[in-house]
Amino acid sequence: MSSESLTVIVGLGKTGLSCAQFLAAKNRPFAVMDSREEPPEWENFIKTYPRVELIRGQFSEKLLNEAQEIILSPGVSLQEPLIAKQAAQGKSIIGDIELFARNVNKPIIAITGSNGKTTVTTVVGLMMKAAGRNVSVCGNIGEPVLEQITPEPDYYVLELSSFQLETTFSLRSQAATILNISEDHMNRYATLQDYLRAKQRIYTDCFIPIVNADEPEIWRHLPFNKKPLSFGLNNAADFSLAEHNQKTSIAYQGKILMPIQELKLNARHHLQNALAALALGTAAKIPIENMLHVLRDFSGIRHRCQWVRKYKEIDYYNDSKGTNVGATRAAIESLGQAAKGQLILIAGGQGKGADFSPLKDVVKRYVKQVILIGEDAPLLEKTLKEITVIKHADSMNEAVKRSTQAAKAGDIVLLSPACASFDMFTNYEHRGDVFTETVEAL
């Protein structure tokens, strides 16, 4: 195998396998390594590519040295010592999004942010479909991007994580946005500024930047080539809220589009998502009627502030996708404002090095009891114990029982962990499913 053209894929999950399939189809020589003994796709890989070198259980410096280019899966940090060493030597280190960007010519809408990106990506995809466009919604949501290159759609709508953006250099989007920023993945970034810098890469070579007017610190120092299109709940913006006939309505540059009561989801974070989707859709020239029709019909995504059921006049919400402090804060604030009573919060898991103190004010205002689960329960307790009643549970079943005992008519039980799930569950979907099944069995 000629090292002059050898590509080494680091990480063999769904993304790594999609990179292998892409390179194999192009007849490009490659090898794969994963520090795990049994990475998720290794059995599929050896069946399909029995003659391709696969190193499991460690990273091979020798193989990395032989590579002309390294494709890094988003789960592997650029700070990984052997990877950092290759970067310092000037080796090309890319991700699957970069490989994708080099090989597509169709317009791209690109979306990132700490919270709401899956919802906004989904909604923009639905708006495209409503306008009769053939669209592929992919990236950090659903299928890996490299599986969507053929057959080619009219449009791509990509959800992108900070990890994916770090290894992307050639993305040229028709429109791109950072929805918001709050602490997340601080186990991978030294500072919040480093995390923001990774996110800001989405605006490189973007034709129409879409910006959050309520968080100008994200974008105000960036050198845009074109005037941004803005959305915001509080500050002046192209897409905003306005009072009209004693109703709060969505407006575009002062023109009333629709009252928010026509939306099935109209809590604050849902409204921010709707405004962002309208701005992105406008940049993609989707007719306004199609966009408003989609917003009226949209009833949310599983595990994202999803209403589960009412039991003894208590409402249960599954926000298992609340894997960081900002997401949980937004969920507490939105549901707290809407609740007749108070909130009982189920939280905890793997905190990823986050600072939990931004939860204090909303917990104090809306939450009468917190049931803690998972390995970082002690850190959450340390932050919140002066503010509200803290209880512990060893399982989701016990957490749901304890929260039901603490709740009374008009209260809301909210699962929004502010943490990753891997200490107790396969992923956040599994955690949300266990919560939902437990609630439905009450």
Swiss-Prot record:
It comes from Coxiella burnetii (strain Dugway 5J108-111). Signal peptide: none annotated. Belongs to the MurCDEF family. It holds the Pfam family Mur_ligase_C. Pathway: Cell wall biogenesis; peptidoglycan biosynthesis. InterPro entries: Mur-like_cat_sf, Mur_ligase_C, Mur_ligase_C_dom_sf, Mur_ligase_cen, MurD. Its main location: cytoplasm. It is an enzyme of class 6 (ligase). NCBIfam families: murD. This is UDP-N-acetylmuramoylalanine--D-glutamate ligase. It is found in: Cytoplasm. Its EC number is 6.3.2.9. Keywords: ATP-binding, Cell cycle, Cell division, Cell shape, Cell wall biogenesis/degradation, Cytoplasm, Ligase, Nucleotide-binding, Peptidoglycan synthesis.
